[in-house]
Curated annotation (Swiss-Prot):
The modification N6-(pyridoxal phosphate)lysine is found at residue 278. One of its GO terms (cellular component) is mitochondrion. This is 5-phosphohydroxy-L-lysine phospho-lyase. Its cofactor is pyridoxal 5'-phosphate. Homotetramer. Keywords: Lyase, Mitochondrion, Pyridoxal phosphate. Its EC number is 4.2.3.134. One of its GO terms (molecular function) is identical protein binding. Catalyzes the pyridoxal-phosphate-dependent breakdown of 5-phosphohydroxy-L-lysine, converting it to ammonia, inorganic phosphate and 2-aminoadipate semialdehyde. It is found in: Mitochondrion. It catalyses: (5R)-5-phosphooxy-L-lysine + H2O = (S)-2-amino-6-oxohexanoate + NH4(+) + phosphate. The lineage of its organism: Eukaryota, Metazoa, Chordata, Craniata, Vertebrata. Pfam families: Aminotran_3 (PF00202).
Length: 467
């Protein structure tokens, strides 16, 4: 039986029997079976079209013909490991170098963002001779054991915090200790990192690196205050550590204004290491780590060869080059600026209309909507967010939630997402929020629709917003 003709229930049963339940699905109560993608759209087994607002992996659009053709043509000729000379890997490194500050001139190619961050940790420790890492609260940097250790998002539910890991407050000016009314939140949050470093040093610890997503995503689509990372870098360098910018979810023009999100700090700010993944290959497993000559030479001085079987293979590099070509020829970075500004403006208008929307923030096609139960305490509207994304799915719009309170709507669509798509999403969001408010006024319990065979539908009892 062809997979695309197999009934959804059969596929789900096979998955439940053959795959671990820890490998979770979107919309677990009623998952979507996707069999085809094109541009910003996904299609299920019944041919229904969904607007994809989640998938920042299909960066230039699902199954972009230029990317597909590049992979196909290179596969017809050669795909082998990178120990042989080949033009693709050096051409790709050259093209990437043109997007980065000149100091970041050495490239390592890998297969996933997790591999890139793991290698960044190795290089930082080798260069500094130190062991410890400073990270932001609720951060996520990958699924390898080394990265779970530096990801509070994961380790708080597992073995806990290692003694060599030090957690600084998330620079969230909406929910954190230093908010929008603080005179200098960038300095205040950077001083928190300084205090974390000082506390570690008093215990005899030495800092190897500070890891942060240039715009924290899993943490809730956070936009750190301008100047924060520059000041953090000063504190980290003073402690003898390196600054690692994790661009895996936010790089390659997504923020519109710049190609890399760390460039929001200004042209004088240069991380010591930059890691890339997800969008870099438009769904093909490609990743990269860029660093300085000095850091790379320290790693080379160990005398231990670094080899990655599939990293930088001819097909992966052909795909990476094709993604860069599409970004340029279709002017998707400028497109992200224009469409993102439109979406941000219209979501902000919804904030004035619906009290459940506490904050709208973002840049380019990286946008978060913080849902609250009340304006004074800013209590996360966790259940309401779950209900909302379920209703959006019923309207063929795929959106996810994240953040410590699981109440942040995350907009990270393919870069071809357009103004018509933005208008459609905002209109549906408005309709559903209006309906939710009507149900609250009538004290009606909201229910997430489950498949017909589910006899225990999830119930969500909402409370009224404070006046």
């Amino acid at each position: 039986m062809a997979a695309d003709t197999r009934a959804k229930a059969v596929t789900l049963d096979l998955r439940r029997r053959l795959l671990s339940s820890s490998c979770r699905l979107f919309f677990p109560e009623d998952p979507v079976k996707i069999i085809r993608g094109q541009g910003q759209y996904l299609y299920d087994e019944q041919g229904r079209e969904y607007l994809d607002c989640i998938n920042n992996v299909a960066h230039v659009g699902h199954c972009h013909p230029t990317v597909v053709q590049a992979a196909h043509e290179q596969n017809l000729v050669l795909n082998t490991n990178s120990r042989y000379l080949h033009d693709n890997i050096v051409d790709y490194a050259q093209r990437l170098s043109e997007t980065l500050p000149e100091q970041l001139s050495v490239f390592y190619f890998l297969n996933s963002g997790s591999e890139a961050n793991d290698l960044a940790l190795r290089l930082a420790r080798q260069y500094t001779g130190h062991q410890d890492v400073v990270v932001l609260d609720h951060a996520y940097h990958g699924h390898l054991s080394s990265l779970i250790d530096i990801s509070p998002y994961k380790f708080r539910n597992l073995g806990g915090q290692k003694e060599w890991v030090h957690v600084a407050p998330l620079p969230d000016t909406y929910r954190g200790p230093y908010r929008e009314d603080h005179p200098n939140p960038a300095e205040a949050y950077a001083n928190e990192v300084k205090h974390v470093i000082s506390s570690a040093q008093q215990k005899g610890r030495k800092i190897a690196a500070f890891f942060a997503e240039s715009l924290p995503s899993v943490s809730g689509q956070i936009i750190p205050p301008a100047g924060y990372f520059s000041q953090v870098a000063e504190h980290i360098h003073r402690a003898g550590g390196l600054f690692v910018a994790d661009e895996i979810q936010v790089g390659f023009g997504r923020i519109g204004k710049h190609f890399w999100a760390f460039q929001l700090e200004g042209e004088d700010f240069v991380p010591d290491i930059v890691t890339m993944g997800k969008s870099i290959g438009n769904g093909h497993p490609v990743a990269c780590m860029a660093t300085t000559q000095a850091v790379s030479r320290a790693f080379e001085a160990t005398g231990v060869e670094y080899f990655n079987t599939f990293g930088g293979n001819p097909v992966s590099c052909a795909v990476g080059l094709a993604v860069l070509d599409v970004l340029k020829t279709e002017q998707l970075q400028a497109h992200a600026t224009n469409v993102g500004s439109f979406l941000l403006e219209h979501l902000t208008q919804q904030k004035a209309k619906h009290p459940i929307i506490g904050d709208v923030r973002g840049t380019g096609l990286f946008i978060g909507v913080d849902l609250i139960k009340d304006e004074t305490l800013r209590t996360p509207a966790t259940e309401e967010a779950e209900y909302l994304v379920s209703r959006l799915k019923e309207n063929y719009i795929l959106l996810s939630i994240d953040g410590p309170g699981k109440n942040i709507l995350k907009f990270k669509p393919p870069m071809c997402f357009n103004v018509d798509n933005a208008q459609h999403v905002v209109a549906k969001l408005d309709d559903i929020l209006t309906d939710m408010e009507e149900k609250v006024r009538s004290c009606e319990t909201l229910r997430i629709k489950h498949p017909p065979e589910d006899t225990h539908p999830t119930q969500i009892l909402l409370t009224r917003q404070q006046d």
